[in-house]
């Protein structure tokens, strides 16, 4: 069983909870990966990072090639590191919540997305994810990675991962305060992304 085997391996490396879900909208022989950090569980010294794997219910046997499997593993690592950054954020400030970003978007859907992505915690966590994505995209070339951050990706089919997600949410406005803050965060995280971990210290997943 793919899910059980993968879950067992992940739990050997990280103290996380794994959840299996089914959705007919998921493409055949594909796995969607999501993650969440629970600050209340963390404060009570319980396992606080949850990974969710979503599969198509019509597929009895999952067929995944080497290339797709590597992609899935990359997404899992990015997701766990994203949530570990959130864990560190909450622990450092004594589990206090931060105020939400005040979006002025007229559309409720856009406003909801901007409130989520505009949060200081998300800018920090996605900053690391984007730094990793860019170094992978440009094979470790910092100059090309930074150059890409200043490109106009509107009306293009260029894959931009989380960076393009932010640009879309904030109307591809490179002068927007959130986009400018995120750019600085990404550049600051490049050396850490090169090491493959968001922090220098080794105790970033321990109390």
Residue ranges of model-derived segments:
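Extended non-catalytic scaffold regions that mediate assembly and binding
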Residues: 19-22, 26-28
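Amphipathic alpha-helical recognition patches that constitute DNA-binding helices
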Residues: 71, 75-76, 120, 124
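Active-site recognition of the HExxH zinc-binding catalytic motif
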Residues: 78-91
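Active-site scaffold of zinc-dependent metalloenzymes
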Residues: 29-74, 90-91
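Zn2+-dependent metallopeptidase catalytic core
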Residues: 1-14
